[in-house]
């Protein structure tokens, strides 16, 4: 994981992310299951699914356009990266973008009600495990709708 201010490229530490309630867990690969199960138990994540995006994904550009629209959710957004890489952009307390590059072995938790967006890296490939407290769902509330 690497994070930095989008405009200035100034590095952002894990502690700075924690200060805005974005949580990061480095996961041991390939033996991640025990740690993942522990995090799920501690945080009440009862459901999970997997999503794969790559150049062969039907309507990839349309999906990425939706993901890159600035939005928030009523629930946390939890992603554990199994393969590939992507960028989460989150807003800090001063409404500045922080870019977070996630890749294989990274688990990130974006808190509920935090504006963010997502896109793939230049490789255009990611395989992620999505974790949920209830039934799997992804309902964005776009910023322009507020």
Curated annotation (Swiss-Prot):
<keyword id="KW-0533">Nickel</keyword>
<feature type="binding site">
    <location>
        <position position="73"/>
    </location>
    <ligand>
        <name>Fe(2+)</name>
    </ligand>
</feature>
<dbReference type="GO" id="GO:0010308">
    <property type="term" value="F:acireductone dioxygenase (Ni2+-requiring) activity"/>
</dbReference>
<keyword id="KW-0539">Nucleus</keyword>
<feature type="binding site">
    <location>
        <position position="116"/>
    </location>
    <ligand>
        <name>Fe(2+)</name>
    </ligand>
</feature>
<keyword id="KW-0028">Amino-acid biosynthesis</keyword>
<feature type="binding site">
    <location>
        <position position="77"/>
    </location>
    <ligand>
        <name>Ni(2+)</name>
    </ligand>
</feature>
<keyword id="KW-0479">Metal-binding</keyword>
<feature type="binding site">
    <location>
        <position position="77"/>
    </location>
    <ligand>
        <name>Fe(2+)</name>
    </ligand>
</feature>
<dbReference type="InterPro" id="IPR027496">
    <property type="entry name" value="ARD_euk"/>
</dbReference>
<feature type="binding site">
    <location>
        <position position="71"/>
    </location>
    <ligand>
        <name>Ni(2+)</name>
    </ligand>
</feature>
<feature type="binding site">
    <location>
        <position position="116"/>
    </location>
    <ligand>
        <name>Ni(2+)</name>
    </ligand>
</feature>
<dbReference type="GO" id="GO:0016151">
    <property type="term" value="F:nickel cation binding"/>
</dbReference>
<keyword id="KW-0486">Methionine biosynthesis</keyword>
<dbReference type="GO" id="GO:0005506">
    <property type="term" value="F:iron ion binding"/>
</dbReference>
<dbReference type="GO" id="GO:0010309">
    <property type="term" value="F:acireductone dioxygenase [iron(II)-requiring] activity"/>
</dbReference>
<keyword id="KW-0560">Oxidoreductase</keyword>
<comment type="pathway">
    <text>Amino-acid biosynthesis; L-methionine biosynthesis via salvage pathway; L-methionine from S-methyl-5-thio-alpha-D-ribose 1-phosphate: step 5/6.</text>
</comment>
<dbReference type="InterPro" id="IPR011051">
    <property type="entry name" value="RmlC_Cupin_sf"/>
</dbReference>
<feature type="binding site">
    <location>
        <position position="73"/>
    </location>
    <ligand>
        <name>Ni(2+)</name>
    </ligand>
</feature>
<comment type="function">
    <text>Catalyzes 2 different reactions between oxygen and the acireductone 1,2-dihydroxy-3-keto-5-methylthiopentene (DHK-MTPene) depending upon the metal bound in the active site. Fe-containing acireductone dioxygenase (Fe-ARD) produces formate and 2-keto-4-methylthiobutyrate (KMTB), the alpha-ketoacid precursor of methionine in the methionine recycle pathway. Ni-containing acireductone dioxygenase (Ni-ARD) produces methylthiopropionate, carbon monoxide and formate, and does not lie on the methionine recycle pathway.</text>
</comment>
<dbReference type="Pfam" id="PF03079">
    <property type="entry name" value="ARD"/>
</dbReference>
<keyword id="KW-0223">Dioxygenase</keyword>
<feature type="binding site">
    <location>
        <position position="71"/>
    </location>
    <ligand>
        <name>Fe(2+)</name>
    </ligand>
</feature>
<dbReference type="InterPro" id="IPR014710">
    <property type="entry name" value="RmlC-like_jellyroll"/>
</dbReference>
<keyword id="KW-0963">Cytoplasm</keyword>
<dbReference type="GO" id="GO:0005634">
    <property type="term" value="C:nucleus"/>
</dbReference>
<dbReference type="GO" id="GO:0005737">
    <property type="term" value="C:cytoplasm"/>
</dbReference>
<protein>
    <recommendedName>
        <fullName>Acireductone dioxygenase</fullName>
        <ecNumber>1.13.11.54</ecNumber>
        <ecNumber>1.13.11.53</ecNumber>
    </recommendedName>
</protein>
<comment type="similarity">
    <text>Belongs to the acireductone dioxygenase (ARD) family.</text>
</comment>
<keyword id="KW-0408">Iron</keyword>
<dbReference type="GO" id="GO:0019509">
    <property type="term" value="P:L-methionine salvage from methylthioadenosine"/>
</dbReference>
<dbReference type="InterPro" id="IPR004313">
    <property type="entry name" value="ARD"/>
</dbReference>
């Amino acid at each position: 994981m690497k994070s930095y201010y989008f405009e200035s490229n100034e590095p952002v530490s894990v502690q700075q992310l924690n200060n805005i309630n974005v949580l990061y867990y480095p996961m041991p690969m390939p033996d991640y299951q025990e740690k993942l199960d522990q995090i799920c138990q501690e945080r009440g994540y009862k459901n999970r699914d997997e999503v794969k995006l790559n150049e062969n994904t039907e309507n990839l550009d349309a999906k990425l356009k939706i993901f890159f629209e600035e939005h928030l959710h009523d629930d946390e957004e939890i992603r554990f990266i199994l393969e590939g890489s992507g960028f989460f952009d989150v807003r800090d307390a001063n409404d500045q973008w922080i870019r977070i590059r996630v890749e294989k072995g990274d688990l990130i938790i974006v808190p509920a009600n935090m504006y963010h967006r997502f896109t793939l890296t230049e490789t255009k490939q990611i395989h992620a495990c999505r974790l949920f407290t209830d039934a799997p769902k992804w309902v964005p509330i776009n910023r322009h709708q507020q």
